[in-house]
């Protein structure tokens, strides 16, 4: 026991619309708007129910409706979406601009459905029918392509929906991470922050201290002075933090005097390293002595060099008790 149509209940006209009725409906809506569809037929002078007027306007008389034959792209879209969505014509119509769901449904039932049946494809499942041998009809290739296209389109639509959701979630997570993160400030001090302010004493910047073995001036070295001084020569590994400016200059002058005192020893050691003949003679003397063919003069020369090297090593690497602590 369903509801009886409103046209039967009220005794209104049914069936196809005439051009005169279409003109009355268009004229009234253009002048007054449709308003309430229930009261529109009486105001427009039509012997139709409100539902019939609404469907006539929505599916046929709207000015933005695309009329005419469906093109090939629209037919493929309808078949692919029908394989995915079934008879949900309103959802299919959203993918076809300016086409109504009623028009799409009519075109499916009158053209596309019959075409699939002739190709041996079930219009409901979009799969080849088992009872009809497709090879005998010569349509197996087209059916396979159509089935594959429908499956691919279904997978594509599902993938697009999934990617849209994931992209929205990633964008939200990135925004939350960006807003929650705060910049980290490092409070470490560089060696320049520990050095004294040399610019406060301009008369000291003009003092040039030259080393007998280096051409670097003291003003060029002041930017690269480390924050602490470690005496490697001491076996105890004593590390002294940077002293004030006056104490540091005194220690530097003391080291400069020590360097001048050892100038003669450094010259001898440099001559030993750079003198190719002396090195060759020392090594040749070592080899000849091992082989039992060395002369007395070479042995004496080798012993002198050995004693000389021992004295240099003792000077460079003194014992902890003799290490100067400035």
From Swiss-Prot:
Residues 280-290 have a biased composition (Basic and acidic residues). The keyword Repeat applies. Residues 197-217, 280-299 are annotated as: Disordered. Residues 37-61, 89-112 bind DNA. Signal peptide: none annotated. Expressed in trichomes, epidermis and mesophyll cells of young leaves, stems, petals, sepals, carpels and stamens. SUPFAM superfamilies: Homeodomain-like. Transmembrane segments: none annotated. GO terms for biological process: cell morphogenesis; cuticle pattern formation; regulation of cutin biosynthetic process. GO terms for cellular component: nucleus. It is found in: Nucleus. Residues 208-217 have a biased composition (Polar residues). Keywords: Developmental protein, DNA-binding, Nucleus, Repeat, Transcription, Transcription regulation. Residues 9-61, 62-116 form the HTH myb-type domain. One of its GO terms (molecular function) is DNA binding. PANTHER family: MYB FAMILY TRANSCRIPTION FACTOR, TRANSCRIPTION FACTOR MYB16. Involved in the control of epidermal cell morphogenesis in petals. Promotes unidirectional cell expansion once outgrowth has been initiated. Coordinately with WIN1/SHN1, participates in the regulation of cuticle biosynthesis and wax accumulation in reproductive organs and trichomes. Functions in cuticle nanoridge formation in petals and stamens, and in morphogenesis of petal conical cells and trichomes. Functions as a major regulator of cuticle formation in vegetative organs by regulating the cuticle biosynthesis genes CYP86A8/LCR and CER1. This is Transcription factor MYB16. It comes from Arabidopsis thaliana (Mouse-ear cress).
């Amino acid at each position: 026991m369903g509801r009886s149509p409103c046209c039967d209940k009220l005794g209104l006209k049914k069936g196809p619309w005439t051009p005169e009725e279409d003109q009355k409906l268009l004229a009234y809506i253009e002048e007054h708007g449709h308003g309430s569809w229930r009261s529109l037929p009486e105001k427009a002078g039509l012997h139709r129910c409100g539902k019939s007027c609404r469907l006539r306007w929505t599916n046929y008389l709207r000015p933005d409706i695309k009329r005419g034959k469906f093109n090939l792209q629209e037919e493929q879209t309808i078949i692919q979406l029908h394989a995915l969505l079934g008879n949900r014509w309103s959802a299919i119509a959203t993918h076809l601009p300016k086409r109504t769901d009623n028009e799409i449904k009519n075109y499916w039932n009158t053209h596309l459905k019959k075409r699939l049946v002739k190709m041996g494809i079930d219009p409901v499942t979009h799969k080849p029918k088992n009872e009809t041998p497709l090879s005998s009809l010569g349509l197996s290739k087209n059916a396979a392509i159509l089935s594959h296209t429908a499956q691919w389109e279904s997978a594509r639509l599902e993938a697009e929906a999934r990617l849209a959701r994931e992209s929205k979630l990633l964008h939200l997570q990135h925004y939350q991470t960006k807003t929650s993160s705060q910049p980290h400030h490092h409070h470490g001090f560089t060696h320049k922050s520990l050095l004294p302010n040399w610019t406060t004493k301009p008369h000291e910047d003009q003092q040039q201290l030259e080393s007998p073995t280096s051409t670097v001036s003291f003003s060029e070295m002041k930017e690269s002075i480390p924050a602490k001084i470690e005496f490697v020569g001491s076996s105890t590994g004593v590390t002294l933090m940077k002293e004030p400016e006056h104490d540091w200059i005194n220690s530097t002058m003391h080291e400069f005097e020590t360097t001048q005192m050892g100038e003669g020893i450094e010259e001898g050691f440099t001559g030993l390293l750079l003198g190719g003949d002396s090195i060759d003679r020392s090594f040749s003397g070592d080899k000849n002595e091992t082989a039992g063919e060395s002369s007395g003069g070479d042995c004496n020369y080798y012993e002198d060099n050995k004693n000389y090297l021992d004295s240099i090593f003792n000077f460079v690497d003194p014992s902890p008790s003799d290490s100067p602590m400035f």
